[in-house]
Amino acid sequence: MTDTIAALVRTVLLVALAALAASAVVAAAEKPGSVTVYVGTYTDGASRGIYRFTFDPATGATTEPVLAVQTKNPSFLALHPTGRFLYAVGEVDRFEGAKTGMVSAFAIDPKTGNLTLLNQKPSEGTGPCHLVVDRTGGNVLVANYGGGTVAVLPIEADGRLKAASSVRAHEGTGPNKSRQEKPHAHGIYLDAAERFAFSPDLGADRVFVYRFDAAKGTLEPHGAAPLAPGSGPRHGAFHPTGKYFYAINELLSTVTAFSYDAEKGALASLQTVTTLPAGFSGTSSTAEVAVSPDGRFVYGSNRGDDSLAVFRVDAATGRLAAAGRVGVGGRTPRHFAIDPTGRFILAAHQDSGTIAVLRLDSKTGMPALVGSPVKVDKAVCLLPAPAR
């Protein structure tokens, strides 16, 4: 009888503990100020689409990830300025029988954070890899790596996408015959006034510049900023002042700092710095670049070295000085995002299937790993979406 009572007590305790754990997760998910983080993935493994988890910017705590919507190869994500819609590239080579990738529009459930597909449209090029929504919420701009094109897709009032209103093809090659045999548009960005768009092209060793008309949904060529041969510019980021632009160069593992003339829409190269430690002899390539919200630091991710390079920004000139490097706690940090408070970096590791949280030192800007990693197979993009 005593054994039976003891077993019953143990069972009751286990059930109670499980209930407490579950309630703690729910409480974390619903905590005021928490951020839903959407995760883009490649779906040729265990992942099935876009995942989401909750992040607490006060503590760095995270919840377990759940599938927000099933979709193919959503390798980059962007949020509508209203917070009601999310857009994702579908990194494929064929869509609706044509040689092109796709862009998907999703409605965000304000209660659960789950996504519902609204519609899909051709990206007007193979292998779409990056996109952005303008601040009017009227257009998606997308870069197609395989096709070497950039396009504008207008957005309806209900969040649905219309067919492309403007498509521009890049030209140029580089000395790296295996990677620069043709143009490879790898990103697209808007300046603060959204008068100009900028597209780093890995194949052409240039950042192409376009005059952007949000009302018409058009891109008009406006020159290009060259980089050193073989650089392979991949992504970019503007400084919060709008006076500088930083391009991260995948093939040479460098960051190029540009000054920016907003009136003319012109970039002028200031310097190029390495993201790797002195004497590094292994194989590595860069992926993402970001500027801290206060503009004091620039971060770049190294795949292979599996680190974040940290640079101090000279506020007067925009030039960079190396501050150090930190391991990211996973393999192949393809993407990372600075949380809206500027206190943390979240890093997505494509090959280890994890997402790390790193706390940023407010004085030095140096990241330090905290907590346990979030597990999402082939995580390649992180999109923090603060509650509205």
Kindly label every feature range from the protein language model.
Residues 11-24:
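Bacterial N-terminal signal peptides
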Residues 43-46, 92-96, 146-149, 204-205, ...:
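Short glycine/acidic-enriched loop and turn motifs that connect beta-strands
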Residues 63-69, 117-121, 174-178, 220-226, ...:
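A short beta-strand motif characteristic of beta-propeller blades
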Residues 30-55:
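An edge-strand/N-cap motif at the start of beta-rich repeat modules
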Residues 64-133:
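Blade-loop segments of beta-propeller domains
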Residues 32, 46, 71-82, 124-139, ...:
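Beta-rich, blade/repeat-based domains predominating
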Residues 54-60, 106-113, 153-162, 211-218, ...:
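Short loop/turn segments immediately following beta-strands, especially the blade-tip
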